[in-house]
């Protein structure tokens, strides 16, 4: 998100917008087709909303600690390896806290989408991505409170923060 520690949505958006311009120029040249220009402006609107959400998150004390973090571990005779999109950090009451975030891009999401996609009706995990990420993060940050969730990207960004219990718990949280 560019200026990692900025709480200014205009500064964050300015960075993201200039990166979009640079990428568009290298990919599509100086005179992209009308359809491409429309898509770029649509994306620019999404980036503006992402900048607002990021600035609000920063104002709440969260900072981006790491991105694209590789991990591997063994559990129960299985080897796990992957890459966490983003890890945020915050001090709360003297105890460090970390939020493991996975970016998701979809066209439309309902308030019940995340829960129904990732938990059974009984509240048991059926999509193990976040529990695996939390397990990895618990080794990266021993003794820290770990939360997890999704940073959804569709027509607008939405981010909500809840603390998850340990990865084996059936409770679910979204960002």
Label every model-predicted segment:
Residues 1-175:
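Structural signature of nuclease core domains in nucleic-acid processing machines
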